[in-house]
Design a protein with these regions (language model features):
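Patatin-like phospholipase
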Residues: 2-112, 140-156
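A short alpha-helix-loop-beta-strand transition element characteristic
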Residues: 67-74, 116-129
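Internal, conserved structured core segments that host functional sites
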Residues: 128-139
Length: 156
């Protein structure tokens, strides 16, 4: 049985930002992967790597902010100081969250539409899997490249 090398990427903006630096270092060392998996922002990062868009991915991450992925979003590191500093952003975010029954991630969807290349994704020899959350049930959903229906790449 041939051994395969896999890269697993987490969800969460801070983890994703850290992982981009680690991925860049691995690629600069000439490391390659047969399988890439990701959750949330890690799935976007992984899909772009599968497409062969590492350089474009690095440029995308250099310009990302909370509002690049979520309308009415705000940065929160768990500290009270940050909470008070961002208090003007919290009320609009909470109102939007309650009214829409979740965060408005239309900016994140736009990134997927703008950067996703279904043809290159499916043509790549790199296997891919992701975990997403089914809304509004908030149940996990797993999808692999081999099971993903053509024409629905950007929906995942």
């Amino acid at each position: 049985m041939d051994e395969k090398r896999a890269l697993t990427l987490c969800g969460g903006g801070a983890k994703g930002a850290y992982e981009i630096g680690a991925v860049r270092a691995l690629y600069e060392l000439g490391e390659t992967f047969d399988i890439i998996t990701g959750t949330s922002i890690g799935a976007l990062t992984g899909a772009m790597l599968v497409q062969g868009d590492a350089e474009q991915l690095y440029r995308l991450w250099e310009g990302l902010s909370i509002r690049s992925v979520m309308t009415e979003g705000f940065a929160f590191d768990g500290s009270l100081e940050t909470l008070f500093r961002n208090k003007g952003d919290i009320v609009p975010f909470l109102k939007s969250y309650v009214n829409k029954k979740g965060a408005d991630i239309e900016p994140f969807r736009k990134i997927i539409r703008d950067y996703g290349d279904e043809a290159r994704f499916f043509a790549s020899p790199i296997d891919f899997a992701l975990i997403a959350v089914r809304f509004p049930a908030f149940t996990p959903v797993e999808m692999t490249k081999s099971r993903m229906p053509r024409g629905q790449y950007k929906d995942w």
